[in-house]
Amino acid sequence: MKRIFQTIALIGKPRNPDALQTHKTLFDWLTGKGYDVLVDHRLANDLDVPQDCLCDLLTIGDKANLAIVVGGDGNMLGAARVLSRFDIAVIGVNRGNLGFLTDLDPESFKEELTRVLEGEFVTERRFLLEAEVHRHGQIKSRNAALNEAVLHPDKIAHMIEFEVYIDDNFAFSQRSDGLIIATPTGSTAYSLSGGGPILSPSLNAITLVPMFPHTLSSRPLVVDGDRCIKLLVSPNNGSTLEVSCDGQVSLPVSPGDEVHIYQSPEQLQLIHPKNYNYYGVLRAKLGWSSKLF
């Protein structure tokens, strides 16, 4: 019987011995079952595995059928921006804090992962955002974000000025500390802490969440996911700004630049155990009340 996943990759730079032990346990367990296992090359100095198993994320995306990300959501975000370019399924073992994107319990993952490897899983496709900085009509820099792209001051927090256009239609101008533009996946992250709404992952929508706006009438806005958001940065801003992608990659923005943010054509193929329930995850992670009866 042909396996659904024959080549499996282990991803995630561990920050603690427990995460490293999970990598080692996974490697030994999967190779013992006859799977071909690739390992994130960033683990080379921490994990005792054959050198020919080590490779970068681009090679993993090209060769593997399944990627197992060990760590927290930050590890998943970093992997997602690369692996979304490839036809590869991704699942996570939670060794972080909240773990909205990493389903498997590190202490008991073997049972659930066995069922996943046998084909008992559900698939979600999560879209990413593309963020571009335009200067004098040319793209100066760009990157992708699974959670959010955030326009904010560079080093010192202060008020900035910009205009917001949706598909070339002027929406509003704003004086604030910045603007969070989030996917449904990112609606439970930075956007949520800024007062934004929680969006079901299947929604084709983008949220715009002002950061400490100067007017009380500024409120979060949800727009169709196929819209292009354009931010025109005022030339009067006295210093350089940034667009931060998932809090991991920063794009410098100068006064007078334009920032274009739109849905990427690439999607992350995220898989979950068969019993996955998004609202159950929200209830557990956010401390919602349990059933009354």
Swiss-Prot record:
UniProt GO molecular function: ATP binding; metal ion binding; NAD binding; NAD+ kinase activity
Pfam families given in the database record: NAD_kinase, NAD_kinase_C
SUPFAM superfamilies, per the entry: NAD kinase/diacylglycerol kinase-like (SSF111331)
Broad enzyme group: transferase
Reactions this protein catalyses: NAD(+) + ATP = ADP + NADP(+) + H(+)
Keyword field: ATP-binding, Cytoplasm, Kinase, NAD, NADP, Nucleotide-binding, Transferase
Compartment(s): Cytoplasm
GO cellular component terms given for this protein: cytoplasm
Top-level taxon of origin: Bacteria
InterPro entries: ATP-NAD_kinase_N, ATP-NAD_kinase_PpnK-typ_C, NAD/diacylglycerol_kinase_sf, NADK
Function: Involved in the regulation of the intracellular balance of NAD and NADP, and is a key enzyme in the biosynthesis of NADP. Catalyzes specifically the phosphorylation on 2'-hydroxyl of the adenosine moiety of NAD to yield NADP.
Protein name: NAD kinase
Organism per entry: Photobacterium profundum (strain SS9)
